[in-house]
Amino acid sequence: MFPTIRSCARGTSTPADNYMLARRRTLQVVVSSLLTEAGFESAEKAAVESLTEMLQSYLSEIGRSAKSYCEHTARTQPTLPDIVVTLIEMGFNVESLPAYAKRSQRMVITAPPVTNNPVVPKALSAGQNKQHPAHIPSHFPEFPDPHTYIKTPTYREPVCDYQVLREKAASQRRDVERALTRFMAKTGETQSLFKDDTSTFPLIAARPLSIPYLNALLPSELELQQVEETDSSEQDDQTDAENLSMHLQGDEVGMEKENSSVLQQNSMKGGEETLIDNPYLRPVKKPKLRRKK
């Protein structure tokens, strides 16, 4: 019979809540059995906790040292010689272990009950579970069912509500206006409502145009380019006409009249094509003088 432990306070956790608490309870059972063999009938909880902590630290140090010796010899799993070397390094008499194991007053601690894994009904199982590879120990939990790896992409449904669309459009318009006003306030001249702090409530300064209709009268770049092209074409036509008149001086008078009429028609067509809609930019036309008969 194990000695009764006088607890100072009730524990708030249970073995089912914490995995490490169950291992801690097993160490407490071992400490209680050692106290019973030593002749103690009862023990304080603080004393049992201290002895349990010492036993846990001792076992952890044995495992850590055995693991380091194992890895030092290029192995992955510790063996009995590794544990023996660890106990010798920690100052433990290894030769006294057989006599201590065969003592007559030792107490046998029963193994904890083994809980079997719940059997999954065949109706709920989908597919065949994946087996563990060679590098994963067998005591690790199994892989989940294959259907857990199936993923279905989700798409966000488009908003079709009229009120929501109007609110969204209004908020976007408001954001654009605010961004534009901030940009204009940073890049252009502003006026402030407060003389001390010019950065608070900046107002965009308006610049009225002195002559509002001046922009409509100024020619654009395209119109200027067209005027230059028409001037150059008229000069080319004049040079061609002079050359033709010099070469055709010895021809008949009828041919001269026909050529002059053709040139006049071409010049009339060119003049009609180069008409400008703006009345202020049209070239001046001289009135034709009628000859007196």
From Swiss-Prot:
Alphabetical UniProt keywords: Cytoplasm, Developmental protein, Differentiation, Nucleus, Transcription, Transcription regulation
Purpose: The TFIID basal transcription factor complex plays a major role in the initiation of RNA polymerase II (Pol II)-dependent transcription. TFIID recognizes and binds promoters with or without a TATA box via its subunit tbp, a TATA-box-binding protein, and promotes assembly of the pre-initiation complex (PIC). The TFIID complex consists of tbp and TBP-associated factors (TAFs). Mediates both basal and activator-dependent transcription.
Gene behind this protein: taf8
Name listed for the protein in its UniProt record: Transcription initiation factor TFIID subunit 8
BP-aspect Gene Ontology terms: cell differentiation
Family the entry assigns: Belongs to the TAF8 family.
InterPro entries per record: BTP, Histone-fold, TAF8, TFIID_su8_C
Biased composition (Basic residues): 283-293
Self-association state and partner proteins as the record states: Component of the TFIID basal transcription factor complex, composed of TATA-box-binding protein tbp, and a number of TBP-associated factors (TAFs).
Subcellular location: Nucleus; Cytoplasm
Compositionally skewed regions (Acidic residues) per UniProt: 226-240
GO molecular function, one term: protein heterodimerization activity
One Pfam family it belongs to: TAF8_C
Annotated Histone-fold domain residues: 25-92
Top-level taxon of the source organism: Eukaryota
PANTHER family in UniProt: TRANSCRIPTION INITIATION FACTOR TFIID SUBUNIT 8
Region annotation Disordered: where it falls in the sequence: 226-293
Short motif Nuclear localization signal, span: 280-293
GO CC annotations, alphabetized: cytoplasm; transcription factor TFIID complex
